[in-house]
Amino acid sequence: MLTAETIAVAMSGGVDSSAVAAMLRAEGRNVIGLTMQLWNQRRLAGHEGMPETVQGRCCSIDDVYDARRVADTLGIPYYVVNHEERFERDVVRPFVEEYLAGRTPIPCSLCNNHLKFDQLLIVARQVGADRIATGHYAQVVFDESLNRWLLKRPADKSKDQTYFLFGLTQEQLSRTLFPLGGMTKPEVRELARKHNLVIAEKPDSQEICFVPGGDYKRFLEAYLTEQGDERAETEIAGEMVTTDGKVIGEHAGVHNFTVGQRKGLGVATGSPLYVVQIKNDTRQVVVGKDEELYSRTLRAHRVNLISTAELREPMRVAVKIRHKHQPAPAIIESAGPDEVIVTFDEPQRAITPGQAAVFYDGDIVVGGGWIENSTQ
């Protein structure tokens, strides 16, 4: 008689991961619940205008409590693993440094790369699990003709999370399940109700888990104050200039801006202006007209390829430059080790350094990398 496979489910306390645990349990798998405690939500309470109390969101104490209640309902073992130190080192600090350097980071992708599909697999082995499962809306399949594991977009394209998963390796994909890949969100909620899970009606988290209210500027100031770092008020201040080099004002720090931003520029002109570029070396914020936001090419670095081992020749793909961006037709070609040049068929608006460029061949994720720069 075959022994049932043991799956460790990454439980955030939300509907999706809870539904995954219930689904696998109903299938007869041995299920173990794992929650990664990543950030103390009360750590910065009261600093630099941060709220004194913080409501629960992914990774909070309240969410750990919800995950534990779900595990109790399902009758599965449940463990909380503290990774706060590593989360701060690999996610929070890079998030802060990227903003201070004038880039716009994606902490969810950093967390996936360094924690959820790295440390979680290590912990899963330690508790005797064969594989891990998460509540991401994505699909993973093995292609025998390519002899590779493939990452694919989910059935419900409105919930597609593959943009944040481009960094997964073949080893990680081979040991990961995405049970919700063929389901819609309403179906997932109905599944949670069917299993009488207390979180069935819990709202989705819509913000960065460690940034209360999504106010990243306030978070940066509070974190820097706690760390005794004065850069937010000193060396990152600079000039605001037009695309032809005319100085039209000053700014309090490049971390206050992102490419494409219109509001909060602090300058009055006769026509709308947008942030076109942030120059880290001179601390200048360059502003211009909407048409000056469009670029045809970008360079991506730290590229991870999934559907192929290497990019031997130019390849036609569709590319997303932000999570909600409609994939745009383009050609990608190697520009050196772990670097790719992307040339779009049509210019794209507000290509933003620090974001990811993710390459698709239909529903298959070819790979992706971090946007370094763009040119018109």
Residue ranges, per PLM feature:
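ATP-dependent adenylation/nucleotidyltransferase module used to activate substrates
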Residues: 1-166, 177, 185-188
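AMP-forming adenylation/ATP pyrophosphatase catalytic core
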Residues: 133-376
